[in-house]
From Swiss-Prot:
Superkingdom of source: Eukaryota
Alphabetized InterPro entries for the sequence: Cell2Cell_Antifungal (IPR051378), GNK2 (IPR002902), GNK2_sf (IPR038408)
Entry function: Modulates cell-to-cell trafficking. Has a positive role in innate immunity. Required for systemic acquired resistance (SAR) which is mediated by the signaling molecules azelaic acid (AzA), glycerol-3-phosphate (G3P), and salicylic acid (SA). Negative regulator of plasmodesmata permeability triggered by SA during immune responses, through regulation of callose deposition. Delays the trafficking of Tobacco Mosaic Virus (TMV) movement protein (MP). Required for symplastic signal transport.
Region (Necessary and sufficient for plasmodesmal targeting): 265-285
Cytoplasmic side: 286-299
Entry GO terms, CC: plasma membrane; plasmodesma
Main subcellular localisation: membrane
GO process terms (BP): defense response to bacterium; response to other organism
Name of encoding gene: PDLP5
Keyword Disulfide bond attached: yes
Signal sequence range: 1-25
Disulfide feature: C36-C113, C89-C98, C101-C126, C148-C215, C191-C200, C203-C228
Residues on Extracellular side: 26-264
Protein name: Plasmodesmata-located protein 5
């Protein structure tokens, strides 16, 4: 009896350790964020059929264009089964790179947003988004993600000036995809292709304003709103939406959050390890007791 209970408990604890220490080779490592609705559709429903059709259209269209929007089925909307969606690649990607990114996003979104009526997956080089309510052409400046790098040296006036110039140039540029550079400082901004010119400028102005006020004194930073983003880095490349190797460590808030999570996880794993060792020890003692059950100290 002791052996059975001990074995069961040991297996449970080992499973807990595995679940708390996920593999770093997860297939979703290269996405920046995912937003999924809590509302779920039923498997094998009409909505799922149309969603699968939409996602397939994303992949097949990347050879012709970096951006496209779809409504499935076409014609009069049917509230319970109609799905709206867009995909968009970074403005300077070639068709092959665009197709690779969108295909990867489509392959991942099913696991990240399983049976969700809406899903929004932002990758390094592209995004895909779908919903059961139309968001096409609708302005949305909701803040989704922002972060700043390490502060620059206060006496590095040259870098501060370059960063300010690059961020400013993103706001005065033309088009929905904008890049800027000054020496070793690079920046990029892009808005969703379904926005009008004025909506795009409005969204980018908000994102760039946040970037300048929050991260203007940092080695880099990024701001992602629902319909646009802006980022810059010192020593990085505008070809990357996320900071390059010289971006620096995360800001103070990010460090505190990450350190707290790390410490908590280390404590939990330490406690579980001690419990496992205790269980193994008790199992060993129990085995000895059964062998020596006629001994007085074990009766």
């Amino acid at each position: 009896m002791i052996k059975t209970k001990t074995t069961s408990l040991l297996c449970f604890l080992l499973t807990a350790v595995i679940l708390m220490n996920p593999s770093s080779s997860s297939p979703t490592d290269n996405y920046i964020y995912a937003v999924c609705s809590p509302a779920k559709f039923s498997p094998s429903s009409g909505y799922e059929t149309n969603l699968n059709s939409l996602l397939s259209s994303f992949v097949t269209s990347t050879a012709q264009t970096r951006y496209a929007n779809f409504t499935v089925p076409t014609g009069k909307p049917e509230p319970t089964v109609t799905v709206y969606g867009i995909y968009q690649c970074r403005g300077d990607l070639d068709p092959t790179a665009c197709s690779t990114c969108v295909s990867s996003a489509v392959a991942q979104v099913g696991a990240l947003c399983s049976n969700s009526y809406s899903g929004f997956l932002q990758m390094e080089n592209c995004l895909i988004r779908y919903d059961n309510k139309s968001f096409l052409g609708v302005q949305d400046k909701t803040l989704i993600l922002n972060k700043c790098g390490q502060p620059m040296e206060f006496n590095d006036q040259d870098a501060l000036t370059k960063a300010s110039d690059v961020i400013g140039s993103l706001g005065t540029g033309d088009g929905s995809y904008r890049t800027g550079g000054n020496g070793n400082v690079q920046g990029v901004a892009q808005c969703s292709g379904d926005l009008s010119t004025s909506q795009c400028q409005d969204c980018l102005s908000d994102a760039i304003g946040r970037l300048k006020s929050d991260c203007g004194m940092a080695q880099g930073g990024y701001v992602y709103l629902s319909k646009c983003y802006a980022r810059f880095s010192v020593g990085g490349s505008h070809a990357r939406q996320t900071p390059g190797p010289n971006f620096g460590h995360e800001g103070e808030k990010g460090n505190k959050d990450d350190n707290g999570v790390g410490k908590t996880l280390a404590i939990i794993i330490g406690i579980v390890t001690l419990i496992i060792l205790l269980v193994v020890f008790l199992a060993f003692v129990g085995k000895c007791c059964r062998k020596l059950q006629d001994e007085k100290w074990c009766k």
